[in-house]
Amino acid sequence: MPGMSRHNQSVGAYGERCALRHLITAGLRPVARNWRCPHGEIDIIAWDGPVLAICEVKTRRTDTFGTPTAAVTGTKARRLRLLAARWLAETGTRADEVRFDVLSIRLTGGPPHVEHLKGAF
């Protein structure tokens, strides 16, 4: 990603792997990871029963720059809604319900702490 150091990219990728494991353990069925188009990226797309979950993953080693969930601004939420509509259109996927989740990953020593906020926005 432009503007991100290799270290930050590595931390983010690790956080996404932690989030994916969490979702699978919770019974969700991932269908896409790091889906990209010219307008942005969706970290994880997964089925939670009949509900399609669009998942944004935020990973932090410290809260110096705010909590992971605070990084999901209104602007980011609007972009994710547009990206989800585009993914649905491009893949021809039909979903009666689409939910937007945020997975907050904190890496503060010891095992990662994963918080899954279903329907975050």
Swiss-Prot record:
One of its GO terms (molecular function) is nucleic acid binding. Signal peptide: none annotated. InterPro entries: Restrct_endonuc-II-like, tRNA_endonuc-like_dom_sf, UPF0102_YraN-like. CDD domains: PoNe_Nuclease (cd20736). It comes from the Bacteria. SUPFAM superfamilies: Restriction endonuclease-like. Gene3D superfamilies: 3.40.1350.10. Belongs to the UPF0102 family. NCBIfam families: PRK12497.1-3 (NF009150), PRK12497.3-3 (NF009154). This is UPF0102 protein Strop_1320.
